[in-house]
Amino acid sequence: MQQAFRHISRILLGLLTTACFDTLSILPAAAQSCSDDEYYYPYAEREERRPLLTSDTTLFYRAVQGAEDLYGRYTDFALPPVALRRRGLDYTSERNTLSGIGLSYRYFTLLRLLGAEESRFSGLQSGPGMLPGPGGGTLFRFPDGEPLQPYLVSVRFADRNYCFGTRVSGTVRLPGGWRLAAGADFRTGRDLHVEGVFTNAVTAGFRLSRTFDGGDALSLLCIVPVSMQGMRLSTSEEAFALTGDRLYNPAWGFQSGRVRNSRVRREMLPLTVAAWETPLAPSTALHLTLGATAGKNRYSSLGWYDARTPMPDNYRYLPSHTGDRATETAWLSDDPHYTQIDWDELIRQNRMAGGHAVYALEDRVERCWDATLRALFTTEVDRRLTLRYGAEVRLDDRRHYKEMRDLLGADHIVDIDQYLIDDDTYGTLLQNDLRHPDRTIRTGDRFGYDYTLTTRHAQAFFEADYRSDRFLGALWLSLGHSSVNRRGHYEKELFPGSQSYGPSRTLRFVPWTVRATAGWSFTPRHYASLTLLASSRTPEASDLFYQPLYNNRTVGDARAERIFAAEAAYRLTGPRVDFEATLFTVLTLDGMQTRRYYDDMSYVYCDLAVTGIGTWSCGVELAADIRLADRWELTLAASAGRYRYVRDPVVTVLSDVDNTPVDRGSRSRMGGCEVGGAPQLTAAGELSWFGRRGWGVHLSAGYAGRRFVEPMALRRTDRLAGQGGITPEAFAAFTCQERLPDAFTLDGSLFKTFWFSRSRLTVSLLLKNLLGDSDIPYNGYESLRVRRISSGDATYYTPHATRYMYLLPRTFYLTISYRF
């Protein structure tokens, strides 16, 4: 009976609708604007028979399955600005990409100005077609649509790193279907807290794109960052105490009454990315990308030739070493002739040296050429299974050399090894470039060393992404081949012929990655997943050579670093609360590092290699977004973990002048040390209020605890700790790791938005470190040097003081932006 009634109702409804349509079709349509189509009929769309829509149940679960990194988003600006190695991992574990091309942080601001959207991924997660790693990353992409307010102009004022900045951006339509987005970011001024620190930087770029009728898409991106920054150096606690200034910076001094910084970083590293996307079949598309970075990175520092170091905080100039009252009085009185670089004195000594410089300002130059070609195929087998596969090749070519910036009143120097002039054994082997001996170096000339490190990499990859209602399964496989070599452009007299000149032997590696993910959506709001990863990666090229400046000798036990990781995550999304919890563990094996230093035990300049480094990280990350009311929001995030060294690495020390062993195969007592610069306890919270008429307030608090200084493997060997630690106290000084104080900061911001018909104006004030606490160390670094103390016939050893850097006190950012 009910079915018959439904059929009769549908027939009557259909007849009534048809009659209405017939009547309306003969009425005049003065208010209806007809198109040029002679068959135009305003109700034709309503008469079409539409098939009954069938819902895709996988759509209900994809939102909760694809949520972003909540912990990272909530802690980026809420935690104290201390050294933060998330999960105890090195920054190289994090991958930031655009169309598969690796990105540096220096390009992020302009990408956002040009309209790029970014997705954050934590830990073992990654975006589509993005090479996974243990440290997560950021995926940038440009959306297809156009912004509602395509133009931006903003100005900002600050007291940290710079004083004034401005940003402009805009998007326009060009003839032929092209779209152009352009932007620029400018910063200038000195730091109002730390003397000698300044920034003069401009970054400009554009993106030109077009989508063709057949579905093809072409884009060209170019970003050019140019910057000059005065840097800040770490120093010992004694120097901070003597000056009474936690922001003491030993890198600057007065020259003719004006502040001059010896450590200035100058960069110009343009980025170009060209992308072509084309459909090959109804279910397959090709995304071809070519990216390149080319430019120079310069870092200046003072050089001294057969003279005393000009750095004022050198241990020999501190009262603890000199032991005289006059030095202590000079430091306590903040006499800049003692506490800072005395540029006028350096120039005076140069003018007394008969034309040859005793002191000079050098630039350490890195000329980069990094190019990547990537082909990504995407095949949608059906609505549940998507395959991504392809290959990429990369060339990373970096040339390093020194260039004379300022002779400080002198006329020239001779390109010889100044440190060997008084050496009884090697004093006759002084030439830095044997093929051009005794070259006279003047301002702008290249000298000292000149070499190129080249890494070639090729890999193929495959990714399968399967979603079936509640279940998500993903698999990533990649296999590659890498080769690394050095090419010397100078022939060092200490290491003649192929020992320093020409190509070194080529080191080859086979990096690979396997990652598997399984997830289950219990409801459209509850999701849990498990991810496993195993991989090996090529070491940094500079860590494969004992002395890359002028020696082709490679580290003997060079291996690819191995990584094993697991991650279990739970995610809840709801109308009031978003919550995420992640358990993680990461084991890294066969890491390696190389250093160059002066060995106080043997009185020889040495090359150090540390191999077989192993670390283990495990812990939990929690994050929640709670919408308390329509205008109130609370975000919370916390983490707890343990990041430590789990193996005793092998330490090899070679003499820098002849490669004779100083210490070979010694074990370092690193097992049990904590990873430095990685807080093992963090917590952050932010309360936000969004008022009427565009007002808003953010108040946030951050905590970072269980922090440790960066440990050095050398001082924990038998040669140093065993020989130098003749008492329990001395042994502990070499082997125990210092814990840094916990950090707590409070931040606040106030903003007001004025809305107009098609534009808006926003004024915001951000205050960092409201409590003004400047006694919080940013980080600490153990020294490689050892101090010898003689008392009668006995000689005692103690490590050099740890070097620190402290947080800035209360700082502000005032921003005025206009979108239209």
Feature locations, PLM:
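Transmembrane beta-barrel wall of Gram-negative outer-membrane proteins
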Residues: 157-189, 193-232, 264-283, 478, ...
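Outer-membrane beta-barrel signature, preferentially recognizing the C-terminal barrel domain
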Residues: 249-271, 275, 453, 504-513, ...
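Gram-negative outer-membrane beta-barrel transporters
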Residues: 467-470, 585-587, 606-715, 817-819
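Signature of Gram-negative outer-membrane beta-barrel scaffolds
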Residues: 360, 388-523, 650
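Surface-exposed extracellular loop regions of Gram-negative outer-membrane beta-barrel proteins
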Residues: 235, 431-440, 483-484, 488-495, ...
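A beta-strand signature from Gram-negative outer-membrane beta-barrel systems
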Residues: 106-156, 165
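C-terminal beta-signal and adjacent terminal beta-strands/loops
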Residues: 32-33, 703-723, 752-820
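Acidic/polar loop-and-plug regions of large Gram-negative outer-membrane beta-barrel proteins
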Residues: 209, 217-275, 298-363, 426-442, ...
